[in-house]
Amino acid sequence: MKYPTRLSDAVHILAFIALYPDCDLTSNKLAESVQTNPAYVRQLMSALRKGELLISVKGHPRPALAREPEKITLLDVYRAVEG
């Protein structure tokens, strides 16, 4: 049985951004880390932006967390990507 991976992939993306705040993180680079395609990463990042967990600007490869990592809960991420 295949399980949805949106939540774990979103957590992976947020953690990667938190660990490398000063690096250029394109959707291609994030997709390589998550082992998926860039379009899927962009969809997740859009959901995370709408959920006010991520700040990013199209064409600017340095996304940032909208809050301190300690203040982002799994429930916040779940609501953003599955809500």
Name the predicted role of every residue range:
Residues M1-I13:
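Short alpha-helical segments that sit at the start of domains
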Residues A18-D22, R67-E68:
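Short helix-capping/hinge SLiMs at alpha-helix to coil transitions
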Residues N28-Q35:
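A short alpha-helical element within helix-turn-helix/winged-helix DNA-binding domains
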Residues E32, R49-K50:
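Alpha-helical residues within the helix-turn-helix
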Residues G51-A66:
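Beta-hairpin "wing" of winged helix-turn-helix
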Residues P69-G83:
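Conserved segment of winged-helix/HTH DNA-binding domains
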